[in-house]
Amino acid sequence: MAVALHVVDHPLIADSLTRVRDKDTPNALFRQELERIGTLLMAEATRGLPTHAVRVQTPLTETLGRQLTSQPVVVPVLRAGLGFLHAAKDLLPNADVGFIGVAR
């Protein structure tokens, strides 16, 4: 079974990752940058989610919009993945959350 690897080469992620890796980054900034990375990665990871057309009444006219066909389940791998959970819930507020624990 071949595993697909998708490399996200984004300047905003690289910028934040540099601060996350810096030993002198204060805790509050570390958490802020980790959330920023999580938001950008979630946007990329959800790019291919299936959607369907829906009719929407705007203040001026009726038009077609797109909605997610179904909500995905967000599953962070404990403990490192918890840093990305807040960003995932911001983008997918109705998603169920599960957890996976892995021991080294």
Regions found by a protein language model. Name each.
Residues 1-104:
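PRPP-associated nucleotide enzymes
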